[in-house]
C-alpha cells in the first residue's frame, strides 16, 4: 500500500508503515516506542495516521484500539510523559476511523463474490444465497448506541447494489460467546436452518474482516462449512480480501484522501455513544477533537 501511495501522493511521500495490535505482537506500546526511536515525536514532531483495518467502526474494535493509542500517547508524549498536555514536538496524530462504503472496498468484495459464484454450475448460480457474516456484538453494546450494526449493513447494501441486487442475501453474525444476548441471527444457525428448508447453495462472505484469521479459517471453514453444513459442496466461502489488488488500491486511495483532507478524523468519531460512560473514551475523543481543531487552524493559516 505504501509503495502505491508513494506513487499516487508524492507530495506526502515517503510513507512508512507500522503495525500495532491490541492483543498480539507488536503491541501498541511497542510500536509507539518504535516510532519515537525512529525519530518521530519526542520533540521532533512528525505526522502519523492511525489507519484502522476494521472497515466498520465499533467501540469494541476501533474504539478500543484508539483508546489504547491515546493511553500510550499520554504516557509517552503527553502529560504523564512530559508534564505537558500538548507537548511541543509530539507526534501529530490523525485517524482513518471508518470506511464501510468506500467504492474500492465495495468493488473488492464484489469481485471476490463474483469469482466464487463462478464455481457453481450456471443453472444453479441465480439461486445461491449470499450470507454476509460479521463478528457479532452483545446487545448491551448495541443498545448503548454503538454504530457497528448500521455500518456493517451499509457495507452489505453497497456490495449488493454493486452486484445489481441479483441474489438473495442475509446479514448474519458469528462468534457469539457467553449467555448474554447478542446480535442475531447467528451464522451457524442460519446455515443449518436454511439447509433444513432445502436451501443448500449458500455463499459465506466475511464482510467485516479484511484478512484471514481464526474466525474465517477455523470458525467459518471448519465449524460452519465443515460441521454445520456437513461439508456440503453447495456451501462455500468467498476468499478474504487479503492481498487483493483492488483492495490494496482502495487502502492507498483512502490514505491519500485522508492525508489531503486536513481532518484529524471523521465527524462521527467525535460523537460518543449516547449510553457511553467510559472516561477513557471521552478523553480519547477530546484528544482527536483537539487534533482536528489544530489541523483546521493550520490549514487556514496556510
Protein language model features and the residues they cover:
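Extended amphipathic ligand-handling, pore-lining, and cofactor/metal-binding catalytic surfaces
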Residues: 1-302
